[in-house]
């Protein structure tokens, strides 16, 4: 059964593609509509309980709070793991800015949790070729952004013994055999149907999807998974990513059996919303929509106080009388992503929604938390030398 459904809907109510996220006018992203449209499955409480049983750890708050909310074949990955069979994690980053922002932390933070919980290898694809094709930047700029972004990623604490980070511009010859096999299985009509490409688009856009698909297959990494391993065709892949990346992997799942591999499994996150509201995601293309890991404490304070959309009352009196609408309040939404303490979050939600907490108070809590995360990350990043970066990106055997 094919999984290649169009990425955008015909009613133009919301547009969700790997390059554009826009909710219906006046609304927020409808995630259940995406689940129906893409054909994925909502993560159930039973699956979370199974996850905890297999790992022996409490589920990450991203799972408990429904931030990672949808999946393809996650149950099969847990079965695979319990059977002692090999699998690996794959995620990526398109380097389009000199620093990661908080939206980028979402998949990487969860991926690190998965690596630690399951003790499995991880490959991270840096799609500097994609950004060159889609953005107004030079190849030299994309290479520079890659270098800076990789240091940001390493500083999150990934295990150097189990992590391989690669740049497409440098590693493409290793991916190319699988890129060719994938490209032969997908025709022009399918690519246009999945991604919405137009005749006026550069041909590089049409040829890129197989490049993002190739790391799903273990023989793209013979230094990690030897080609003479009799089980190589049974090694599975789990991809933590935002749900806008799903079209790439629907395509990949459709053709996996034709090139002798297992379908990649996915676990999808919601978007980290822009400061201005839930209608789109935090984006490096709009600096006013994002808080960066390179921002100063004053910049963080200024962005949250000036730009974070509030669901609170317009005056102190209104807030005390009616409380805040948490469903539209960006400050509270950010805390659901970043504040790990469930009881503290519950207390904030109660006090803010009932008017016992003012907008300025909750924004200050967020400012302090964001600055704490940024300072901790800057300290870790300062220890990432070029030598450490080179090791993470070197072609070598991993220990797992």
From Swiss-Prot:
Record family assignment: Belongs to the class-I aminoacyl-tRNA synthetase family.
EC code: 6.1.1.2
One Pfam family cited in the UniProt record for this chain: tRNA-synt_1b
Motif ('KMSKS' region): 281-285
A GO CC term assigned to this protein in UniProt: cytoplasm
MF GO annotations: ATP binding; tryptophan-tRNA ligase activity
Protein name as catalogued: Tryptophan--tRNA ligase, cytoplasmic
Lineage: Eukaryota, Amoebozoa, Evosea, Eumycetozoa, Dictyostelia
Species annotation: Dictyostelium discoideum (Social amoeba)
Cellular localisation: Cytoplasm
Name of encoding gene: trpS
Catalytic activity: tRNA(Trp) + L-tryptophan + ATP = L-tryptophyl-tRNA(Trp) + AMP + diphosphate + H(+)
């Amino acid at each position: 059964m094919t999984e290649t459904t169009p990425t955008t809907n015909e009613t133009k109510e919301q547009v969700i593609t790997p390059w554009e996220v826009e909710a219906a006018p006046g609304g927020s992203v409808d995630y259940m509509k995406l689940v129906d449209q893409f054909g994925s499955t909502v993560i159930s409480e039973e699956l979370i309980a199974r996850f905890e049983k297999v790992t022996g750890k409490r589920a990450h708050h991203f799972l408990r709070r429904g931030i990672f909310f949808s999946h393809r074949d996650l149950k099969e990955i847990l079965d695979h793991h319990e059977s002692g069979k090999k699998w690996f994690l794959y995620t990526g980053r398109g380097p389009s800015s000199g620093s990661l922002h908080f939206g980028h932390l979402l998949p990487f933070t969860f991926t690190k949790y998965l690596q630690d919980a399951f003790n499995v290898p991880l490959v991270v694809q840096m799609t500097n070729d994609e950004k060159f094709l889609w953005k107004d930047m030079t190849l030299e700029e994309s290479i520079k952004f890659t270098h800076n972004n990789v240091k940001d990623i390493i500083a999150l604490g990934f295990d150097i013994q189990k992590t391989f980070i690669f740049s497409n511009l440098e590693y493409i010859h290793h991916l190319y055999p699988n890129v060719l096999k994938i490209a032969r299985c997908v025709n022009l009509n399918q690519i246009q149907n999945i991604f919405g490409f137009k005749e006026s688009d550069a041909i590089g856009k049409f040829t890129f999807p197989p490049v993002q698909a190739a790391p799903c297959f273990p023989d793209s990494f013979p230094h990690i998974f030897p080609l003479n391993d009799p089980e190589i065709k049974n090694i599975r892949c789990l991809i933590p990513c935002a749900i806008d990346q799903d079209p790439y992997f629907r395509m990949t799942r459709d053709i996996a059996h034709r090139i002798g591999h297992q379908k990649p499994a996915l676990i999808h996150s919601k978007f980290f919303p822009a400061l201005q509201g839930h209608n789109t995601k935090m984006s490096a293309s709009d600096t006013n929509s994002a808080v960066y890991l390179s921002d100063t404490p004053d910049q963080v304070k200024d962005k949250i106080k000036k730009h974070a959309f509030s669901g609170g009352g317009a005056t102190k009196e209104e807030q005390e009388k009616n409380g805040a609408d948490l469903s539209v309040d960006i400050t509270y939404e950010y805390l659901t992503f970043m504040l790990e303490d469930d009881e503290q979050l519950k207390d904030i939600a109660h006090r803010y929604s009932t008017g016992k907490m003012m907008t300025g108070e909750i924004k200050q809590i967020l400012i302090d938390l964001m600055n704490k995360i940024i300072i901790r990350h800057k300290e870790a990043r300062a220890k990432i030398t070029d030598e450490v970066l080179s090791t993470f990106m070197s072609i070598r055997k991993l220990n797992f």
